[in-house]
Amino acid sequence: MKKRLVAIVMGCMLALTAVGCGADKNAQTAVESTESNAAESAETETTSDSNTEAETEENAEDSTDETADADDTSSSDVTTDRSGNAITLPENVENIISMSPSTTRILIDLGLADNIVACDTYSFASYGTELTEDIPQFDMMTPDQEQIIALGADIIFTTGMSASHGTDVFEAVRESGACVADIPSSASLKDIEDDITFIGECVGKSAEADAIVADMQQKIEELAEIGRSIPEEEKKTVLFELFTPSADNPIIYTAGNGTYINEMLEIIGAKNVAASETDQWPALSEESAVASNPDVILTADMYTPDVINTILTMSGWENVNAVKNAEVYQLSSDAVNQPNHHVIDAMIEMATSIYPEKYESVALDDAA
């Protein structure tokens, strides 16, 4: 139940932060309402000037060893974070605080689970079994800055979600001299790739990060090749929903143009019914969603019990193609909502659900 509540809160927050501090009031209301419901229910180049061959070889070996050691613990070239803020990385990065589930997942996959000394509550809800037991957890929106400072981490990775209300909730941490590296919510697959590269550079895992990005790019191209082969007239229309409308909240939050979810749908040869919306994360009325008559409905809702049947039996939706043909599919909420390389898992889920025959050669086990 806790992970389901986390999933819906994260979905709301993703929609809110992607459009920045000026997000519409409906999105903010949805976040606050969801958080309330959740409460109720329970991040020199070395050279040698030696003139002798022996000294040159020795220095070259030393340089190689130092480079290898440095790649394990730190990076020297990063001067700004992903938000453009100037940062100074410590010489060695050993202890890390991650305040975003997407970053936490990347760090774990870089082999740094044991280096994470604290995280946000959502990270622990999703990945607690892979982290050190009983590590401190902080609220993403109102973190205990004094305790974070006291932990003395080498780097703190933060997210744009924490600044969605227009306040720098890590101001005191920055002023303490700690290295705070902010990573805004990614809007594209390229953004996600750049985030992974940035994190790898910060923690001395550039080679490993590059390998993750290369694998991600390879998978995207494999899917894109199939997507390009689908004739325009055979492309299915798709409604993606973050969570299912209800009597209490009849609004459908979906992914519009300028989002990596819309990008993924286009790559696999599908048509997003919300692609023409001006907002990145538009709020659709049920009437508008029904009128779009999607061929397929994809839901990231991990909260509504028996969500597929709930959608298939919603009053007023019986004439929607996706409902008539039982083309309603549930995606992994963590995979689709957390902007890291595992969005490829969600992309494969999308592709094999929408076009099972065309993507039958693509295995989810081969995903990033």
Where are the regions a protein language model picked out?
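Alpha-helical, coiled-coil/dimerization segments enriched in small aliphatic residues
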Residues: 121-125, 251-281
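Extracytoplasmic ligand-binding site segments that recognize negatively charged/polar headgroups
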Residues: 164-168, 184-198, 231-260, 305
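Short secondary-structure boundary segments
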Residues: 160-161, 242, 277, 300-304, ...
